[in-house]
């Protein structure tokens, strides 16, 4: 996965844009972060990229209304729960089933 530094991004943030990880500071990005972003790339591919971003935004807004917190909304999203829950498992993507993130939509935390 390609990792790109962008001075417009906060230092400890990383965003996956169409399979490219973008961060304000790339020195903190390790194998686990790269694996996390690769999981997002798999999610994007199965949704054909643009619908992923639309669903991601809609789910974040719904979770924000339910959680009243930007960070809690982010961490409770199905896409993020799959990625955070499996980013330490470097073999996860080989075993991952298609649309695995759907299993996290209504699953309690």
Language-model regions: role of each:
Residues 1-7, 33-40:
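Short secondary-structure boundary segments
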Residues 42-43, 87:
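Activation segment
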Residues 13-34, 44:
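Short pre-active-site segment immediately N-terminal to the catalytic Zn-binding motif
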Residues 2-12, 48-109:
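Metalloprotease/metallohydrolase-associated module, dominated by Zn2+-dependent proteases
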């Amino acid at each position: 996965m390609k990792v790109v530094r962008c001075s417009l991004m906060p230092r400890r943030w990383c965003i996956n844009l169409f399979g490219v990880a973008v961060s304000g500071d790339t020195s903190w990005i390790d194998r686990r972060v790269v694996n996390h972003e690769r999981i997002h790339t798999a999610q994007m591919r199965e949704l054909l990229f643009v619908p992923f971003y639309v669903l991601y935004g809609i789910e974040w807004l719904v979770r924000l209304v339910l959680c009243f917190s930007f960070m809690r909304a982010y961490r409770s999203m199905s896409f993020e729960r799959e990625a955070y829950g499996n980013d330490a498992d470097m073999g996860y993507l080989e075993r991952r089933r298609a649309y695995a993130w759907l299993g996290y939509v209504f699953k309690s935390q």
